[in-house]
């Protein structure tokens, strides 16, 4: 559909629905309070204020208010989280990066099912931007800090758990969303959920189009996207809190990206690189309540990605097929004093096909597997004191046996205040790309090992104000990083990192609310890199959000400021100021003229900031991937 026709049609819909305006009760935004229940930190339901961890939550209401396009946008403004894209969104190319507490070792779960494919990208084994079906999400839990005992070695930085919706009994709901946006953007989404006679389901389909964009200096940047995604969840309630759930997720896209970008020189590449993605994931999950105290959860899954980048340039193409298969079997036993979680976890990563720069040598045909046993006891010693010891045993097919203990002590000062202190060890095996890529791979890599200390608090200061604060210190040896001296992945010795974050949520009255976040990050420098991963991570990050709700209208203003991101070693004098320090502000508003329709309008990058998430990798070039300037989106959602 031509975008001008789509925009005009949407405007007509807005005017039509507005003619039947009705009033509704004023409701405050649904912040996830400290008394709500989360599951990711301990793999058992627990009030957030009682969780001995730093957990942030993004609710379905927040997603609906701010119209996040994908999961990466939803978690981008959480203190401690850094998202870095080399395009308008993370769906172009495959080197987008995710960091939590300074580490890119993050586990992604959907309803507790592992979605990682180790070696999938240069930056991370997690591709949040491809999780675009947002209507099916109930909330997103972000666990910040090492969680290796329960989730494995690649949870050094933390865990992101996407919890999907389940329709209420005897209900069927349908939503249709259509929107048009700047840069020839179009989006069409259909969502249906239901729960009848013990069967429940959720089905979502989305089509998204986007063209070339202009950055904050009005430079044209090559960027094309034609993406389709589908989610299916089918479940059966078996009675006695038991269920069987099947899920299937599909993502497919054609994209274009610039061969190079020159933010520093104010120009841009005119060479288009063409790529495709074809990813899917399938899982089966069985939950059984054996007794009042004992329950079991068994999951089997398979994740697959097919990636073709720059396929029209045979000498510079990069193709990669990856597959991860695995299962988990967990037992949970509870009484008044103990919540014991134990289980077995197995996964296998493999690269069936690999082609890079006219060669299939190296990574193709390689695979690695990991088998783990874990146990953790959340022991309530008194009404105020609790301790959570845990241990994990891993057997890696290449790197052998490793044991990682953990312990956390919690002190519940009163009903509104909880303190915790934790120590956790981790073991991170090199992924297949780091080991076997024929250009940058290094078969002599050793696993990265280390430990993290963490101290924090969760406090409900009064009925309208809550706070979470956290400090951490990590020591690691055999750091696995790309070396610009050898042009390969190397073990770069030891490093220490430290940081912390503060989150505040304030409800001023039924109409006005605000959030504030601050993050500090410091990672020691080395002989080959500057501090903070060669100047990639900012020293300071500020997050601020303000929301207004009244009757059928709501609006949100939210932004992030990046401060003290210095850039890599050897870049002195050529690093744009927009890379070191910048802020980006967004605005969204919603109006519900009738019960069955909601009109929304969104402005991204209100002040037309000129900035980039990702800088150049080497000192010999001037590649700076500038991000979109001010842009708009207008849409409507119909609910049945």
Predicted regions and their residues:
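Outer-membrane beta-barrel signature, preferentially recognizing the C-terminal barrel domain
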Residues: 264-289, 416-418, 424-477, 481-507, ...
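Surface-exposed extracellular loop regions of Gram-negative outer-membrane beta-barrel proteins
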Residues: 252-254, 260-265, 350, 355, ...
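Extracytoplasmic beta-strand/coil segments of soluble accessory domains associated
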Residues: 47, 72, 76-114
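Gram-negative outer-membrane beta-barrel transporters
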Residues: 380-386, 473-475, 491-572, 592-598, ...
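Periplasmic-side early beta-strands and strand-to-turn transitions of outer-membrane beta-barrels
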Residues: 161, 169-171, 190-277, 478
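Face-selective signature of the C-terminal outer-membrane beta-barrel domain
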Residues: 237-252, 273-414, 461, 465-472, ...
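Short acidic/polar hinge/loop motifs at secondary-structure boundaries
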Residues: 97, 115-144
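N-terminal periplasmic accessory domains that precede
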Residues: 71-74, 96-99, 109, 127-130, ...
């Amino acid at each position: 559909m031509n975008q001008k026709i789509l925009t005009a049609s949407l405007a007509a819909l807005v005017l039509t629905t507005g003619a039947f305006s009705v009033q509704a009760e004023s409701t405050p935004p649904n912040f996830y309070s400290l008394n709500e229940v989360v599951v990711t930190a301990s793999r058992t339901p627990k009030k957030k204020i009682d969780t001995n961890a730093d957990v942030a939550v993004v609710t379905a209401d927040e997603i609906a208010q701010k119209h996040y396009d994908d999961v990466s946008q939803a978690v981008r403004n959480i203190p401690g989280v850094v998202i870095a894209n080399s395009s308008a969104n993370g769906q172009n190319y495959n080197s987008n990066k995710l960091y939590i507490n300074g580490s890119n070792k993050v586990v992604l779960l959907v309803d507790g099912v592992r979605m990682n494919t180790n070696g999938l990208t240069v930056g991370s084994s997690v591709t949040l931007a491809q999780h675009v079906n947002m209507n099916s999400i109930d909330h997103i839990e972000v666990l910040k800090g090492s969680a290796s005992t329960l989730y494995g070695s690649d949870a050094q930085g933390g865990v992101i758990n996407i919890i999907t919706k389940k329709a209420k009994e005897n209900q069927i709901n349908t939503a249709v969303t259509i929107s048009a946006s700047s840069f020839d953007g179009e989006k069409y989404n259909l969502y249906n959920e239901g729960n009848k006679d013990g069967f429940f389901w959720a089905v979502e389909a989305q089509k998204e189009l986007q063209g070339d964009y202009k950055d904050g200096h009005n430079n044209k940047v090559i960027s094309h996207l034609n993406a389709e995604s589908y989610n299916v969840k089918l479940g059966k309630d078996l009675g006695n809190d038991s269920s069987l759930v099947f899920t299937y997720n599909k993502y497919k896209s054609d994209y274009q990206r610039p061969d190079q970008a020159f933010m520093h020189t104010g120009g841009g590449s005119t060479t288009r690189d063409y790529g495709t993605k074809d990813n899917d994931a399938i899982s089966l999950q069985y939950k059984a309540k054996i007794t009042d105290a004992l329950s079991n959860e068994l999951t089997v899954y398979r994740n697959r990605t097919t990636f073709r980048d720059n396929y029209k340039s045979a000498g510079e193409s990069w193709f990669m097929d990856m597959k991860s298969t695995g299962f988990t079997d967990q037992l949970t036993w509870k009484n008044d004093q103990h919540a014991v979680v134990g289980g077995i976890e197995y996964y296998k990563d493999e690269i069936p096909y690999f082609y890079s720069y006219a060669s299939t040598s190296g990574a193709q045909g390689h695979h690695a597997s990991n088998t783990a046993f874990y146990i953790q006891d959340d022991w309530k010693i008194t009404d105020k004191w609790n301790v959570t010891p845990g241990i994990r045993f891993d057997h890696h097919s290449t790197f052998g046996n490793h044991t990682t203990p953990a312990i956390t002590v919690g002190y519940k000062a009163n009903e509104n205040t909880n303190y915790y202190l934790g120590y956790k060890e981790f073991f991170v095996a090199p992924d297949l790309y780091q080991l076997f890529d024929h250009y940058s791979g290094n078969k002599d890599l050793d696993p990265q090992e280390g430990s993290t200390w963490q101290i924090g608090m969760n406090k409900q200061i009064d009925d309208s104000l809550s706070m979470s604060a956290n400090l951490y210190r990590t020591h690691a040896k055999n750091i696995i990083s790309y070396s610009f001296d050898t042009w390969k992945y190397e073990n770069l010795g030891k490093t220490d990192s430290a940081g912390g974050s503060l989150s505040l949520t304030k409800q001023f009255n039924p109409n006005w609310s605000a959030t504030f976040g601050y993050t500090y990050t410091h990672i020691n420098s080395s002989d080959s890199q500057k501090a903070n991963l060669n100047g990639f991570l900012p020293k300071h990050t500020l997050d601020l959000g303000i929301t207004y709700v009244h009757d059928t209208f709501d609006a949100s203003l939210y932004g992030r400021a990046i401060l003290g991101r210095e850039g890599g070693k050897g870049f002195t004098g050529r690093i744009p100021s927009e890379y070191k320090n910048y802020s980006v502000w967004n605005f969204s508003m919603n109006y519900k003229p009738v019960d069955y329709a909601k009109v929304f309008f969104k402005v991204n990058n209100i002040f037309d900031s000129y900035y980039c998430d990702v800088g150049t990798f080497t000192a010999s070039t001037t590649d700076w991937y500038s991000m979109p300037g001010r842009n708009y989106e207008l849409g409507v959602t119909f609910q049945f």
